[in-house]
Each structure stands twice: as C-alpha cells, then as structure tokens.
C-alpha cells in the first residue's frame, strides 16, 4: 500500500524568562464553587498569559500591575507586590447575572460587530509573540508532540492572504512514524495554514446562518448563538459569539461541528484508504491592547477528529492546537524571519534549547507526554523523530 497522507487545516501560555522581571505562580478558582477557571486572562500593559486546565498560571513581567479577568466574573486589578503576600489560590467572584434570564432587543449586534471591524482590529502591519502547542494522537495514543515559541508578522489581523512571515525562537518536538510502504500517516499543516485559518473565519456570512436574540452575560457583554439556515448542510458549523456592547468587538467565539449532520459528512477516498473529519471544535478569545486600542486573538484552541479506514481497519486521528499571544504588538524593527511558513510543522528544523525548555515553566510536559517520550519504541516498526 502506498503511503497516504491525510492533511487538514486545523494553546498554556508562556513568556520567556528574562532578568529583572516579576514572577507570579498561582491557581485561579471560582469563589463560590471552588472550580478551577480555565482560560482566564492575566495581563498588564506589556504582557499576557492565561490559565491552564487546572486554573494554574505563571506570569512574568517587568511591569508591577496585574489584571485578572474572565467573562462572567468581577475583574481583579492588583500588583505583583500585593499578590506575593497571598496564598497560592486566588478567587474570582461571579457577577450577579444569569446568562439566560435577560433577552434584549432585536438590534442587529452581529451587523454592528461587522461594521466596527476596521476600527476594532489592526489593519496595518504588526508583530505578535506567540506560543503554539500541537498534539497528534492515533487511536487515542500520542504519536507527535510539538511546542513552539516565536513571532509572526502580518499585514493585518483579519482577511490576510497568507502574507505571514515567521521568526521561530524555540522548538521542542518528539514523534514516531510507522516504517514501510504500508504505513498510513497524518500530515500536520504549516504555520501559514494555521494562522490563515485564525485570520479568516472570525466572521460568518449572515446569509447562511440564523442568529439568536442577544442574551446578557454581564453589563458589557452579550451572547448570540448561531445555527445554519440549512439543517442538512454538514459544511456549516454551530456556535456562538460573545460581543462587547461598548465597542461591538467580538470577545469570544465558538465554532464547532453540528452533531446532527455528522452522518452526512462524506469520505474522501484514495487508493486503499478513505477518511473524513467527524468533529471540529474551535474557541477564540480576544483581548484589547491598552496601548494600541486594538483587539487581538489572545488565545485560541482547535481540536479536530479525523476518521479513516485502511481496508477494514478503522483509524481515528485527534489533532489539537493551542495558541497564546504573549505580546500582541511587539517591536516590529527587531523582527527577523527565519523559517519557511509553508513547510509542514513537524518538518521544521529549529535547534532544541534545553535551558529554555527546562526553565520556562509555562508549557509543561504532562505525565502522558513524558511516558510517551520515555517509552521504548520498536525501531523495526517506528522511526523516532526528535530534536532533543
């Protein structure tokens, strides 16, 4: 069987350590339920980070101020100095609003968000510092892990035409590939592909979707759900927008596969193999930079499940991307492109910096990842690919 490549377009934080910076490591939970708060934003005028699945974050900055916020909760404004005297766990207070209690007017808030796009989002060249994690699983088992720290330069945030250039600063990768011509494989997309997707589908064609009446989240945010007008259209997603009613900026978006149409998704057929995407989930969170007055995608998550058959054997691939932007408008003059953005992610070659990865504390390897890396892999069956 010929080698077949399944290609699809399909975030944990970190800020590089530097001298004379303040350091903060805490857990963030709901004050009432004590549940960990995932993807809450911690920032000041210079730096950004977010909490992980356990509500944990590590924040570095030379600026003493700290703002901690999450939709539906009271914002906490404090300092590194003040937080250094607190316990390891911080509590956010839920705002006294119920999501489904208040339904507002018929004003087309979606159209207002579209009308304000050119003022809310950067429309001129800018550079962002980012971290990106990619994980690939085959039938529930890890096969590839890749972490990046780097910078991206683009002409504008939305509607870009793959006019990206990249400066990768650090990379850590480990993976296995089956040997032999009967091997099936999964081709992870390029940096261009990943950022192209995040740049181009923040907005939807209103002609193709039904939008719900807006519902109040808090005094500044409304939620609008959407569904495709054609219930049988498997190519259209379901999801929601959360929009700031002060400036009509999109603050959060969910875009996912409609479970009612999965059975309609056809297979792509090639010699000896057929495959299809059976689940897709994307979540974008945007923040406003205080200095520039523009919004940027601070945190994005993409999870994709691909089902394939090699003969009678069913294979399920799960690929996930996690992105966080730590410096949304960094120094344009210091940007130096050093990699080909069109090259498949796992084929990029950047030397491993042991000191960086062992001290950054922001993209830690999970126990599952460590077990995968340390596990003996049969050299007759697998080819190990690693830069460390």
Identify what each model region corresponds to.
Residues 24, 31-45:
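Short, ordered, surface-exposed loop/turn motifs in non-cytosolic proteins
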Residues 24-31, 55, 90:
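A short, amphipathic beta-strand motif
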Residues 1-27, 388:
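Bacterial Sec-dependent N-terminal signal peptides
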Residues 47-56:
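Short, acidic Ser/Thr/Gly-rich low-complexity loop/linker segments typical of extracellular
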Residues 44, 68-78:
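A short, solvent-exposed loop/turn motif at the edges and junctions
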Residues 34-37, 58-65:
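Short Pro-Gly-centered beta-turn/loop motif in secreted/extracellular proteins
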Residues 88-220, 270-388:
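Surface-exposed, low-complexity/disordered segments
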Residues 198-257, 290:
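Extended beta-strand-rich segments in extracellular/periplasmic secretory proteins, especially
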């Amino acid at each position: 069987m010929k080698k077949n490549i399944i290609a699809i377009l399909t975030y944990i934080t970190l800020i590089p350590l530097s001298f004379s910076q303040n350091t903060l490591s805490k857990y963030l939970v709901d004050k009432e339920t004590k549940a960990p708060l995932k993807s809450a934003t911690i920032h000041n005028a210079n730096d950004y980070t977010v909490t992980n699945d356990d509500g944990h974050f590590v924040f570095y900055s030379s600026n003493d101020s700290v703002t901690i916020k999450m939709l539906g909760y009271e914002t906490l404004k404090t300092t590194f100095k003040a937080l250094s005297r607190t316990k390891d766990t911080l509590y956010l207070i839920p705002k006294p609003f119920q999501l489904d209690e208040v339904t507002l007017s018929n004003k087309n808030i979606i159209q207002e968000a579209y009308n304000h796009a050119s003022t809310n989002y950067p429309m001129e060249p800018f550079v962002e510092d980012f971290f990106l994690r990619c994980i690939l699983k085959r039938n529930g088992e890890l096969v590839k892990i890749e972490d990046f720290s780097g910078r991206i330069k683009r002409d504008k945030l939305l509607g870009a035409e793959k006019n990206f250039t990249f400066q990768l600063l650090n990379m850590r990768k480990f993976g296995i590939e089956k040997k032999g011509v009967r091997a099936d494989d999964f081709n992870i997309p390029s940096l261009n592909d990943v950022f192209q997707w995040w740049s181009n589908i923040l907005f939807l064609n209103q002609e193709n979707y039904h939008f719900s009446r807006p519902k109040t989240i808090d005094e500044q945010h409304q939620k609008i759900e959407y569904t495709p007008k054609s219930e049988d259209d498997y190519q259209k997603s379901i999801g929601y927008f959360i929009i700031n009613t002060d400036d009509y900026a999109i603050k959060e978006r969910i875009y996912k596969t409609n479970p009612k149409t999965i059975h309609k998704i056809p297979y792509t057929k090639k010699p000896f193999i057929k495959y299809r995407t059976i689940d897709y989930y994307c979540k974008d969170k945007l923040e406003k930079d205080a200095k520039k007055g523009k919004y940027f995608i601070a945190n994005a998550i993409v999870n994709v499940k691909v089902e394939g058959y090699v003969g009678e054997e069913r294979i399920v691939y799960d690929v996930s991307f996690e992105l966080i932007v730590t410096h949304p408008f960094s120094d344009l003059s210091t940007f130096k492109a050093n990699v080909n953005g069109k090259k498949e992610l796992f084929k990029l070659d950047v030397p491993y910096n042991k000191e960086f990865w062992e001290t950054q504390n922001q993209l830690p390897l999970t126990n599952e990842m460590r077990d995968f890396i340390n596990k003996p892999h049969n050299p007759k069956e697998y080819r190990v690919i690693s830069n460390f």
